[in-house]
A protein has these predicted regions:
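Aromatic-lined substrate-binding rim segments of carbohydrate-active enzymes
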Residues: 69-142, 256-269
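N-terminal carbohydrate-binding accessory modules
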Residues: 28-81
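Polysaccharide-binding and catalytic clefts of secreted carbohydrate-active enzymes
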Residues: 144-312
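Short, acidic/polar
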Residues: 63-76, 301-315
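Catalytic-core region of carbohydrate-active enzymes that cleave or remodel glycosidic bonds
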Residues: 261-271, 308-407
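C-terminal beta-sandwich/jelly-roll accessory domains of carbohydrate-active enzymes
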Residues: 457-470, 485-557
Length: 557
């Protein structure tokens, strides 16, 4: 049985084609450039003129060399990614000032094409994890031309000052050279779809630069444009932001302005969407480093952490997305932190999140609740041997499932009719309420491996066995395709159906149950054309540990 993609998907494709045609005549002859499209207040990422969800895998920080990437590709493919996230190092492409070498850059890009993967490219310039480690040696060694941040005691630290025009111009020159080369070698293929500018930028070791020049700026007035954008009263940084946030806000303004200038210059050459990621800090973060979580101490000062988002949006308009890296956060913290990045002015993209089982749950949750344009896991190439590390297997299973249903998922995101139910530490299930049906998702008992069968669910919640630990692998997506039709997919759960309260109906019945996938946007049954009509009574669907995808039709009576 076949079905065509929904009307919303067609509208998005049409809109993207119109917009891509207007970017510039220079791009009219090949594939349209990847871009973000906002329709009815919701963002969709368009690749080759079609809606796309990034299923990302990021390699380790020092893996972006041709020989190391050769070892990474099998693990990335085993994880079912459709996009690889890898860095480009300033100190590798410009070892000598003004002399650029893109030979490794080209080799890795060709490898990605050979793997049929898209690329999210990360610029490791002046800032990487609150330090300057990937800047060229000629920058690091010339402390006069490229001044370092001074801490409160006047001691220089391992961070370049965001107030240095010389540093900004050098960083920008290298980034523009890279974007110019990228346009030359990738304009026809459009392998690269998204740019990250710097990496977890900020100052680690000091809340701000205490050099005389920077201190003079700090004691002066807040720029009028920022005051107006944030709807505050004029004054010094302390007067406007208060003593607790003044220094971090000061650093955030100058750092965001620095990075925005680089992003803007790159877009003038090749207008790919850009994002900035952050080492999240402050309230609701899980402390993995046994330290006070303060700006400049527990996390780099000045980055787009959640309490600096308004400032960054005001001072960095050429950055399309601000994202939090939450790869070491438990699921409860993931939800609290990332909810703050879901804003009308900010598409949701999580580039570094899925290193554990928590990431697999977080992915389904983000698809439905935010809704995410993409998701990524850091360090996919890690571990010994050639096999994918065990902690990535569950997210890889999620990716496999979403790859098989992506057209429907995107359409459901756009319509707001996609919901998620994911297991937490003590939660045994979740109620999902749609217009005509009330669904109860019950999480099945915990297997330790995707190869083990789950414990059968009780026949009725009213006669359930005593509480057991919920399966950490239990996660479900449910989408309402029509008034009486649902897409159900997930792992280790059972889904029960009843009519909604007040509907005038007391029971539900399946008319048709199909297992299947989407191929080129068209639903295809995988159970050899058979449908299950009398096999699910009362109406309940069980999802296996290996994962199940169903499309069901019901009636109420």
């Amino acid at each position: 049985m076949t079905r065509k993609p929904g009307l919303l998907a067609h509208k998005l494709i049409l809109l993207a084609l119109v917009l891509s045609a207007s970017v510039t005549l220079a791009y009219a002859q090949g594939k349209p450039i990847a871009q973000l499209v906002k329709t009815d207040g919701k963002f969709t990422f368009m690749v080759d003129g079609k809606p796309f969800i990034i299923l990302g895998g990021q390699v380790n920080n020092d893996s972006a060399f041709p020989d190391r990437m050769e070892r990474a590709w099998p693990k990335l493919k085993a994880m079912n990614v459709n996009a690889v996230e890898y860095p480009v190092y300033w100190n590798e492409i410009e070892r000598e000032e003004g002399k650029f070498d893109f030979s490794d850059f080209d080799k890795i890009l060709q490898q990605a094409r050979a793997q049929n993967l898209r690329v999210v490219m990360l610029w490791f310039g002046a800032y990487k994890n609150g330090a300057m480690d990937w800047a060229p040696n000629w920058v690091k060694s010339d402390v006069t031309r490229f001044p370092r941040v001074l801490d409160s005691g006047g001691k220089p630290i391992r961070v370049l000052s965001p107030h240095s025009r010389t540093t900004l111009e050098a960083d920008k020159k290298a980034y523009v050279a890279m974007m110019t080369h990228l346009r030359q070698v990738d304009e026809a293929d459009r392998t690269v779809i998204l740019m990250q500018v710097e990496n977890e930028s900020g100052l680690l070791g000091s809340i701000r630069d205490y050099s005389p020049e920077s201190t003079k700026l700090f004691n002066g007035p807040v720029p009028a444009s920022l005051v107006a954008a944030l709807k505050k009263q004029p004054g010094t940084w302390t007067e406007v932001f208060g003593s607790r946030l003044a220094e971090e806000s000061f650093t955030a303004y100058y750092l965001s302005s620095y990075i925005n200038e680089i992003a803007r210059a790159g877009k003038q050459i090749y207008p790919l969407a850009t994002y900035v990621n952050t080492w999240e800090g402050g309230e609701d973060t899980a402390d993995a480093f046994d330290s006070f979580d303060r700006a400049g101490e527990g996390y780099p000062s000045g980055g787009p952490v959640s309490h600096m988002l308004d400032l960054w949006k005001a001072s960095a308009p050429d950055i399309d997305i601000l994202s939090a890296d939450t790869s070491v956060q438990p699921f409860v913290n993931f939800r609290m932190i990332n909810a703050r990045y879901v804003r009308p002015d900010n598409p949701y993209w999580s580039p570094e999140a899925g290193r554990t089982m928590s990431g697999a749950r977080a992915f389904f949750y983000a698809l439905a609740e935010y809704p995410a344009i993409g998701f990524g896991a850091y360090g996919v190439d890690g571990g010994s041997g050639s096999e994918l590390a065990a902690n990535y297997v569950d997210l890889g299973a999620d990716y496999r499932m979403v790859n098989a249903t992506m057209p429907a998922i995107i359409d459901l995101q756009a319509s707001g009719k996609l919901k998620a139910a994911v297991a937490d530490d003590v939660i045994r299930g979740k109620n999902l309420i749609f217009d005509r049906y009330h669904l109860l998702v019950r999480f099945l008992a915990a297997p330790n491996s995707l190869t083990q069968p789950p414990t059968p669910a009780p026949q009725s919640p009213a006669f359930a066995s005593p509480p057991q630990a919920p399966a950490p692998a239990a996660r479900v997506l449910v989408g309402e395709l029509g008034p009486d039709e649902f897409l159900i997919m997930g792992f280790n759960a059972a889904v029960d159906f009843r009519p909604t309260v007040g509907s005038g109906f007391t029971a539900a019945q399946f008319l048709q149950v199909e297992e299947g996938v989407y191929e080129n946007g068209v639903w295809k049954t995988t159970n050899v054309g058979r449908t299950y009509q009398g096999s699910f009574t009362p109406p309940s669907i069980s999802l296996t540990a290996q994962g199940s995808i169903y499309r069901v039709k019901l009636m109420r009576y």
